[in-house]
UniProtKB/Swiss-Prot annotation:
This is Mediator of RNA polymerase II transcription subunit 12. Belongs to the Mediator complex subunit 12 family. InterPro entries: Mediator_Med12. It is found in: Nucleus. GO terms for cellular component: CKM complex; mediator complex. One of its GO terms (biological process) is positive regulation of transcription by RNA polymerase II. Its main location: nucleus. It comes from Eremothecium gossypii (strain ATCC 10895 / CBS 109.51 / FGSC 9923 / NRRL Y-1056).
Length: 1358
């Protein structure tokens, strides 16, 4: 082809000298005409006429110019210094100042001020009447009226919101609406600029106008959106509303694109609006808005640079993931009265549509935005991780992109995990092999600790179970914690442990969790769960009697298994088949068969299994015939019939001795009996019946499940006779508060029915008791623990509010109105109001009279009237009531039983007893149990102990009574695992150990609580370290308290056993067999110096292990790093910077040098050590960063300065493990930010300090992209692009028919010739070689074309 290199292109803004005639070529001058001024003419004439001469600096040109230069250089330097000073001042005052507005908004804010050319004038503001203004708007909305006629004036007082409202209400044509907005903008701007005050600028006025207009546009848009529910059932109004919204969105889009609003403010509003929308009815329109303005919020980056609004992108990412998660979890999208909730097809379509739109947004961010958008806090990542994986993996992509997507997901996951910095993943313990094999085939006896060391042990799960509250979200717990089948064993052993036997809700809670797991989407197979339960039972049978009693409370195990049977989780036939196939029942020297026989006797057996049950008992008759003789199926039926007859005769004492299977049959029969009508009429239930049935079901039979079934029956059938019966029932519900959500199937329906009974039925039936009885604690209990249920049902919320407020007003009225009090008192005692006077002067007489009747009279009616009278006195005048009750208590004319009775009927509190009488009486009262008046006494006692836990325990701590000592242990064991009281428990245990002079019998008593072998041991027989062999997840809180005491004693040298902290901590790790719980032993250590010493011991040992050549012990290292992490979290609560001593810092530097000297193979083998090292580095990173900065500031090239280079070198050499590389990237990026901050920070010292130099290794840190975390050496060595998701393209051969590209001549508008180029556009750029050359040449076709204003065009040349 002919070269066009020297062809000149005609200039654009210059006219030719000759006109273009025919085919002649235009001729252009090579200079522009001179446009000069009068002054320039004078200067030119004077220089031309007189000439110009510049005299020499020296007299003779031959003389050296050195003197002249020496003179001028200092002047030049001074001038240069002045200029540099001005530059620095300008930089600090102008350039480096952070503007309050975004650059985008500043760039686009002056468009409307460019009005027009000469002769243009803005419309005038004219005052019009309402009628004329309406007429003007009608003409403006009509396209038949010329705009030039209307453009001369605009109505006065017609601004912003009014203009926008009229635009969408009258549906102005968009061009005219934009003209009106622009004109109003300009008029306001012109008015404001004419009134500028000193110091104000035009930019400030423009910014103010943009904010005002944007806020107006946003508020109207928000108002229109929230008006939507008003028109659901009004078709006529909905037809008006829809066009208005559509028009206004269109108008907003035009204003957005034309720069008539602050885009930054609008984008932030839109993201926040989508975030705060919770009702699904607003979501479709919100997502539609987001779709319209999506390019402004998330502009495409093409992977080059992150946009300026990265914060907004991160925020909208979290919002979209949250919406996606909420829609997936929600069952119904429809909230419309015209549709039923069970409209499954319509609901599924809505759900699918919303999810598709959300997925599209999230995928767009994932593919086209920076990965930083998916870096989020711990709680968000845990919640949305599965959503992100589901969205991305369901996206249909080509094979080439699949690996890139996988790499991105790994990068996001590891980055979040490294920032989250959780503990290491839990690993299987050495004893987990017991759970991996079939339990029924194990011939050896399992040891106790092997069973307790369950695989995948989760201490956090035990903590949550111990702190269970009524309203806890157990569905979320199952999703996040119940992740593998091995967790079943941990939950069962938690519920059946002797230390948890006082937990009334343990068995029912575990059963509910297993049910939730079986019904969840990611459920465990039923047979796997049942097999795991029976395996654990067979493991229990292998234990000796002593070991079994240490870890299992057998009645609790029987109760739990029967609940499982009731819910269908396990089946007795399966258990019997396993017993038969195992052959255990036929082995003569096996003691397992007796355990299984006792278990079978206590399991509920159906009549169909009668023969198999009897057969199993017959098989051991030669070893022990009593099992079959006493407990065969027929004998159990006889015990059932006997129990029925005794219960009908009100004889309940012998029921407690029955096997649990018989108790279940008796409970089912009694439930049917009390729910059956008499003469076709259901008998009303009074207070006595409630207490009696609770005593039978809850105390004698231990079947609280059937009691709750009876409670549901009497509530739904509205059988409560009076307020007293309701009060007794509510006391039971409050005492067993954790069972409320577990055993009440429909809490909303139950509460609605209960409120209806209270406010409609009993209010009229028992109005007297209604006015003096408070139920607000129960209403508050429900609203506090079940807010989600209250939000779901607006009717329930309204009813709860009504009863709560009405009761509150009623009680306040009694305190202010003596007339109402007199009326109520007269009605209680059935006396005439005229003959009775109630006042301050006769309050003592009334109080003493009623109190005497209550305590001394045997008549139930008289006691009830006295109780109501005292309750009325307490409500009417609490101050006087408390005063006279104090006088009564000080006289000490009462018995303990009488005080307990006063507490049981809610007329006395334990706080009053503690304050007035003292601890002696209080201690005796707390040791009593009383159920005669219901459960209020037990409920009040429990609440008092929780509130005054430390005081109560101190009363029993030093008591010599065996009963007091037992109660002290009971309280410690029951409340010890509770996180809210654990600090107080730890303090009490430590004080007891200090006072006992190294007598550790208290620890042994706590460890052996509930067992039969209470061998306390002596001082000489107790080995401190060997105590930790008993460590398991159920008694961790005991060892935490003991570790707190003992480590502090070792630190202070207060022990006499010759131990040191170093020996102690490593000995207990060995003795616990690297138990994962060992890392939590120091969670209760409060002394900061002790924590610092412990951290120093662990880190020094780890560094020495890294420097040695010993093989790695994976289990030991796992326990060590978890311990270090826990200690660092504890220290971070007290100090922001965790320092290191000189020896530890020296070891850290030496370990870094060893890692940097390793090759990649050695580093790969030391991966776990390097990971732990980096986490220790992060623990001390503030301290280390300060050391590095001090070294860089002083220009010392010592170990601290080399640390930066070593980190960067490790970053380059750890391509084999992405997580390690991300940890190093976190450290390097944090160090870079820290150094930059130190550079800009002003020195506190006035003297000049050396400027901090940023290391080149930090300056060249790559951005957070995929390419920054790929192993370049492996790429260049292997040439393999598969891991990027890219396939190598073969170089296409040159087409035979001609070239694929042609040169196009702009002048002649013809294709001149073909152009042969190399396929540089392919990703694997295979360069061709020059003829006779063995090296590659650079394909610069695109660069060459650009030099001639040429480009590639995708148009078809034909």
């Amino acid at each position: 082809m002919s070269s066009s290199r020297y062809i000149l292109i005609p200039p654009e803004d210059l006219h030719p000298l000759t006109s273009n005639t025919g085919n002649e070529q235009n001729i252009y001058p090579d200079f522009d005409p001179w446009a000069h001024t009068e002054i320039e003419d004078k200067i030119l004439l004077s220089f031309v006429a007189k000439g110009h001469y510049t005299s020499a600096k020296v007299n003779f040109e031959s003389i050296s110019a050195r003197s002249s230069l020496q003179e001028s250089l200092p002047k030049v330097a001074g001038m240069l210094a002045e200029q540099f000073s001005k530059v620095v001042h300008l930089r600090e005052q102008t350039i480096n100042k952070v503007s309050g507005e975004s650059e985008e908004s500043i760039r686009g804010k002056a468009k409307f001020t460019d009005l027009a050319g000469p002769g243009f004038s803005l419309p005038n503001r004219v005052t019009l009447t309402d009628q004329r203004r309406t007429q003007w708007l009608q003409e403006l909305s009509s396209p038949n009226v010329s705009l030039s006629k209307l453009a001369k004036s605009i109505p006065h007082g017609f601004k912003r919101k009014q203009i926008l409202e009229q635009c969408y209400m009258r549906q102005l044509p968009l061009q005219r609406a934009i003209w009106l907005i622009k004109s109003s903008y300009s008029i306001e701007w012109k008015s404001l600029t004419s009134k500028l005050k000193p110091g104000q600028t035009n930019e400030g006025v423009v910014s103010q106008l943009y904010n005002l207009w944007t806020n107006s546009m946003v508020s109207i848009m928000e108002r229109l959106l929230f008006e939507m529910p008003k028109y659901y059932n009004d078709t006529a109004q909905a037809k008006i509303w829809k066009p208005r919204v559509s028009y206004y969105i269109n108008l907003l889009g035009n204003c957005y694109n034309m720069g008539l609003m602050d885009r930054g403010v609008f984008n932030h509003w839109l993201v926040e609006f989508v975030e705060k929308v919770e009702n699904f009815e607003f979501l479709p329109l919100s997502l539609h808005l987001l779709n319209i303005f999506w390019s402004g919020i998330c502009p495409p980056t093409h992977g080059i640079e992150a946009p300026d609004n990265s914060f907004l992108i991160s925020k909208i990412t979290v919002v979209l993931l949250h919406k996606h998660h909420m829609i997936l979890q929600n069952k119904s999208m429809i909230n419309d009265e015209n549709y039923i909730i069970n409209d499954l097809q319509r609901n599924a379509r809505l759900k699918e549509s919303l999810l598709l739109r959300l997925k599209a947004f999230i995928l767009d961010i994932f593919h086209h935005q920076s990965l930083e958008a998916f870096i989020m806090p711990n709680q968000n990542w845990d919640l949305y991780k599965n959503c992100l994986y589901e969205i991305v993996t369901m996206d249909k992509t080509s094979n080439e992109q699949a690996m890139v997507i996988k790499r991105k997901l790994e990068l996001i996951t590891y980055r979040n995990d490294s920032l989250q910095f959780n503990l290491l993943k839990q690993y299987k313990m050495k004893s987990s092999s017991l759970y991996e094999s079939d339990g029924v085939e194990i011939d050896n006896l399992c040891d106790m600790q092997s069973i307790l060391n369950v695989p995948f042990l989760d201490p956090e799960m035990t903590k949550i179970l111990d702190n269970a509250t009524p309203g806890y979200d157990w569905t979320l717990f199952v999703q996040q914690r119940f992740t593998c089948i091995e967790k079943v064993a941990q939950m069962i052993m938690w519920a059946t442990n002797p230390s948890r036997k006082a937990r009334y809700d343990g068995a029912h809670l575990v059963a509910k969790l297993l049910l939730l797991k079986t019904t969840s989407q990611e459920n465990l197979p039923d047979y796997n769960m049942e097999d795991m339960i029976w395996k654990l039972v067979f493991h229990f049978s292998k234990l000796s009697e002593r070991e079994l009693s240490n870890i299992v409370e057998l009645p609790s195990l029987y109760e739990l298994l029967n609940i499982f049977i009731g819910y269908g989780i396990i089946k007795v036939p399966t258990y019997i088949r396993k017993l038969i196939s195992s052959g255990i029942m036929y082995i003569s020297d096996s003691k397992d068969k007796f355990f299984h026989c006792e278990l079978l006797i206590n399991l509920k057996i159906s009549p169909l299994m009668k023969n198999q049950y009897n057969m199993m008992l017959k098989n051991i008759m030669e070893y022990d015939a009593t099992y079959y003789v006493r407990y065969n199926y027929e004998q159990l039926q006889i015990q059932l019939n006997t129990a029925k007859e005794q219960m009908l005769q009100e004889q309940f004492e012998h029921i407690s001795c029955l096997p649990i299977s018989v108790k279940i049959w008796v409970s089912e029969w009694y439930l049917s009996y009390v729910c059956s009508p008499v003469d076709n009429v259901l008998k009303p239930v009074d207070k006595g019946t409630v207490i009696k049935n609770f005593t039978i079901f809850g105390l004698y039979l231990k079947e609280i499940f059937h009691f709750y079934k009876w409670v549901e029956f009497i509530v739904y059938h509205q059988l409560l006779a009076d307020i007293n019966a309701l009060s007794a029932l509510i006391d039971v519900l409050l005492y067993y508060e954790n069972l409320f959500p577990l055993l009440i199937n429909d809490q909303i329906l139950f509460m609605k029915t209960l409120i209806h009974i209270y406010s409609k039925g009993l209010k009229n039936k028992d109005n007297l008791s209604y006015n003096i009885t408070e139920f607000n604690p129960f209403w508050k209990f429900f609203m506090k623990h079940f807010p989600y249920l209250v939000e779901i049902d607006s009717d329930l919320q309204l009813q709860l509010g009504e009863v709560y407020e009405s009761e509150k007003i009623r009680i306040e009225k009694l305190t202010k109105s003596s007339v109402d009090v007199i009326t109520l008192y007269c009605n209680i005692n059935q006396v005439n109001e005229e003959s009775f006077k109630f006042g301050t002067h006769n309050f003592p007489g009334i109080f003493q009279q009623n109190l005497k009747i209550l305590l001394k009279t045997e008549s139930a009616d008289a006691c009830e009237r006295a109780r109501k009278g005292l309750s009325l006195l307490m409500l009417a005048n609490l101050g006087d009531y408390t005063k006279f009750m104090s006088i009564f208590l000080k006289r000490k004319d009462y018995t303990i039983e009488q005080l307990v009775k006063l507490i049981s009927v809610k007329l006395l509190t334990l706080d009053q007893i503690q304050k007035i009488i003292g601890d002696d009486i209080l201690r005796e009262i707390l040791s009593r149990n009383n159920y005669g008046e219901g459960l209020w006494y037990e409920l009040h006692k429990r609440n008092f102990i929780k509130k005054n836990f430390k005081i109560v325990l101190s009363m029993y701590r030093n008591s010599t009574s065996l009963d007091d000592r037992k109660l002290f242990l009971d309280l410690l064991v029951f409340y010890g695992p509770n996180s809210r009281l654990q600090e107080q428990v730890t303090t009490i245990i430590c004080n007891c150990l200090r006072e006992s002079n190294e007598d550790y019998s208290l620890i042994l008593s706590l460890l052996r609580y509930g067992t039969k072998n209470i061998d306390q041991g002596t001082q000489e027989t107790i080995n401190i370290a060997k105590l930790y062999e008993n460590l398991n997840f159920t008694n961790l809180w005991i060892f935490q308290a003991f570790t707190n005491y003992y480590t502090e004693a070792l630190f202070n040298g207060a022990t006499s056993d010759g131990q040191t902290i170093t020996n102690f901590v490593f000995e207990l790790i060995d003795l616990t067999r690297y138990n994962v719980l060992c890392s939590h032993l120091f969670d209760r250590v409060a002394n900061f110096d002790v924590l610092e010493k412990l951290l120093e011991v662990f880190e020094a040992d780890f560094f020495k292990k890294c420097l040695s050549e010993d093989p790695d012990d994976v289990h030991f290292l796992a326990v060590m790093i978890e311990t270090i992490m826990n200690l660092s979290r504890k220290m971070n609560q007290s100090s922001a910077v965790i320092s290191m001593n000189n020896e530890s810092f020296r070891l850290l530097q030496a370990t870094m040098l060893k890692f940097t000297s390793m090759n990649k193979t050695a580093l790969c083998n030391s991966e776990m050590k390097l990971s732990i090292y980096l986490k220790i580095f992060i623990v001390h990173q503030k301290f280390i960063f300060q050391k590095v900065c001090d070294s860089l500031r002083q220009d010392r090239y010592d170990a601290e300065a080399d640390l930066v280079k070593s980190l960067r070198l490790l970053f380059e050499n750890t391509g084999f493990k992405l997580k390690l590389r991300l940890l190093l990237y976190d450290i390097l990026s944090s160090l870079k930010s820290f150094v930059i901050y130190e550079c800009t920070k002003k020195s506190e010292s006035k003297r000049e300090t050396r400027k901090l130099q940023i290391s080149e290794a930090l300056q060249n840190l790559p951005p957070f992209h995929i390419s920054s975390f790929l192993d370049d050496m492996s790429i260049s060595a292997h040439g393999d692009f598969d891991f990027l998701g890219l396939t190598e393209q073969p170089t296409p051969a040159e087409p035979e028919e001609g070239s694929q590209f042609f040169l196009y001549n702009k002048r002649t508008r013809e294709y001149e010739c073909g152009l042969n180029i190399e396929p540089f556009q392919l990703l694997p750029n295979h360069q061709s070689r020059e003829p006779g050359s063995s090296c590659h040449f650079f394909n610069d076709t695109a660069l060459s074309l650009s030099l001639f204003d040429a480009r590639f065009d995708k148009k078809n040349p034909t």
